[in-house]
């Protein structure tokens, strides 16, 4: 557990190696670093295989449950009961109390010294796995927080890296959650601007930005809603902090963000059901994320550098939550070098989505400059968080890793998704009109308005994409 005391408490790392399919495989395995922090790489095996299907033809795929996640000395908090999840999501004090109770429980575990779950220590574990596999070099693929892990591995073990792909770049000096608030505000402003510039969206949602500000100004407000998980009627208090937090996760995915104009209009009219359902329909289930590992990392690496007060972008509630939780969370030692990004001897491909609310291109572009001439930053303008979800980008990653030379890798064509449009704003279907009975043998009584044989066509509903 403590690298400085090898004779002390021992932990076991959960590692899965998915062998390459080819008979003559390449000697450099692909190490996949999951996001969060707190996700289990092994738990994402299906996703990892999908994202790297072509890479895995000729290279072993190595999935390591980072210490504190999955089955590697897990630091899992209790999952709230279905009828408690909404109350905790809307009330910071309940969430803080639950985290305090979780911390007390975790500290009683044999591996419960929460100081020893930092990214630096975890990457030493990863290099021990590399050595055990007998691989002179590895290729790295990191997503979201996994990009921070990959950058730390590259910093600490530069000669062990052949190629690196980091998607949704979260550099080590990016202070969570303060940067989240800045980037989420920018993504929301972009949504408002794009809606105003689109004729259909502007007609359906005029002055959307002003409606949003009016909504925030109208809060707090006590409302009756249907719990989006249980369906039971629930009385809750909606605060501006809670509403700002609810719109954050849908911004990750443009298809989900397309629902936000409608959800905001509904909330402004006092109907919060759409917004609550949208926020609960995506993202990780609580059981998928090791909250103990998450806070052990963030409280050690980010919290000491968190500004004393929220900046101009405000606080979605996360800053207050982390300040309260980290005030009592044990903090591990973080070397000063962790926050630096040296010039890379290995080619690095950095991927970003122009609509990403948490790791937008500004972070990748700064990291690429620091990494030097062997770094290449690619932005998919109308994508959100995670460019490798786009099939043609996965092909670009395959060609980058598989290229025979560094020069060929850095010259790979990665512009395939440049013309991908932003999904149009969601428009709810028009309500169906009753159709009177008829003796006309050429039509059915239940034919919809506008169907063949109908007496009077009506405008078709907008495509609800």
What is each stretch, according to the model?
Residues 269-272, 373-375:
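Structural alpha-beta junctions
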Residues 227-245, 252-256, 284-292:
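Structural motif
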Residues 251-265, 269, 304-309, 405:
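Short helix-capping/linker segments at secondary-structure and domain boundaries
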Residues 214-218, 253, 266-270, 281-285, ...:
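A short structural micro-motif
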Residues 264-265, 272-302:
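Long, low-complexity segments enriched in small/aliphatic residues
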């Amino acid at each position: 557990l403590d690298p400085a005391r090898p004779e002390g408490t021992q932990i076991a790392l959960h590692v899965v190696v998915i062998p390459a399919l080819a008979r003559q495989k390449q000697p450099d395995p692909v190490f996949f670093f999951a996001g969060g922090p707190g996700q289990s790489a092994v738990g994402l095996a299906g996703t990892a295989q999908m994202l790297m299907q072509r890479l895995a033809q000729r290279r072993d795929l190595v999935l390591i449950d980072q210490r504190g996640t999955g089955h590697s000395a897990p630091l899992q908090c209790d999952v709230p009961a279905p009828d408690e999840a909404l109350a905790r999501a809307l009330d910071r004090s309940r969430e803080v109390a639950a985290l305090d109770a979780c911390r007390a429980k975790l500290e009683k575990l044999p591996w419960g010294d929460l100081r020893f779950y930092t990214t630096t220590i975890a990457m030493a574990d990863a290099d021990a796995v590399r050595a055990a596999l007998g691989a002179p070099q590895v290729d790295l693929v990191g997503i979201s927080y996994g990009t921070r892990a990959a950058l730390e591995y590259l910093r600490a073990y530069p000669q062990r890296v052949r190629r690196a792909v980091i998607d949704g770049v979260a550099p080590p000096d990016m202070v969570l959650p303060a940067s989240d608030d800045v980037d989420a505000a920018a993504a929301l402003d972009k949504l408002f601007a794009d809606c105003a510039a689109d004729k259909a969206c502007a007609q359906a949602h005029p002055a959307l930005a002003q409606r949003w500000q009016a909504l925030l100004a109208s809060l707090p407000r006590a409302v009756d809603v249907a719990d989006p998980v249980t369906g039971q009627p629930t009385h809750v208090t909606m605060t501006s902090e809670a509403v700002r937090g609810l719109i954050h996760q849908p911004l990750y995915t443009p298809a989900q963000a397309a629902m936000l104009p409608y959800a905001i209009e509904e909330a402004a009219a006092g109907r919060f059901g759409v917004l609550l359902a949208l926020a609960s329909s995506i993202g990780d289930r609580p059981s998928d994320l090791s909250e103990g590992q998450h806070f052990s990392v963030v409280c050690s690496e980010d919290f000491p550098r968190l500004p004393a007060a929220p900046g101009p972008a405000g606080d979605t509630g996360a800053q207050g939550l982390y300040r309260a939780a980290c005030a009592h969370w044990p903090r591990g030692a973080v070397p000063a070098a962790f926050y630096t990004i040296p010039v890379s001897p290995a080619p690095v491909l950095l991927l970003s989505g122009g609509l990403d609310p948490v790791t937008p291109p500004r972070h990748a572009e700064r990291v690429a400059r620091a990494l030097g001439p062997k770094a290449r930053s690619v932005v998919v303008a109308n994508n959100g968080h995670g460019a490798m979800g786009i099939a043609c980008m996965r092909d670009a990653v395959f060609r980058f890793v598989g290229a025979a030379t560094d020069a060929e890798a850095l010259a790979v064509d990665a512009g395939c998704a440049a013309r991908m449009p932003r999904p149009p704003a969601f428009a709810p279907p028009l309500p169906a009109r009753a159709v009177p009975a008829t003796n006309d043998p050429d039509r059915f009584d239940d034919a919809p308005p506008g169907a063949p044989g109908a007496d009077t066509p009506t405008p078709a509903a907008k495509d609800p994409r």
